[in-house]
Amino acid sequence: MRLEKTMTDMGRIGETPRGGLTRVALTDEDKRGRDQMVAWMREAGLAVTVDQMGNIFGERAGAETLPPVMMGSHIDSVPTGGKYDGQLGVMCGLEILRTLNDARTRTRIPSRSRSSRTRKARDSSPR
């Protein structure tokens, strides 16, 4: 249920009257979505970083210092994109990390949820 609520809440940012969304990279809606993603990652206790391209990473430590397992996608959309355009991969990654935390599961390998913007920023930004 939590994943469904997270998907619904993110889907409201940039929602269109016909049920889709427009959350084009580098717009106010994109910023609102990215700010919400950072807030959820911090609420989940993840160490949040943003790289020079604007990719957001939420990392959960592992028992050993190893390269992290990474999962994610993008939360921006093309104009009039589908409600789940890209965000499912990001939200599933976040939900997996939340669930591991809820169960107090200590993993050997660090885990990282990623919200990417590099490809979509090129494809969907206003010209």
Can you name each region flagged by the protein language model?
Residues V78, L88-R127:
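Acidic/histidine-rich catalytic neighborhood of metal-dependent amide-processing enzymes
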Residues M1-G82:
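Acidic/His- and Gly-rich active-site-bordering loop/insert found
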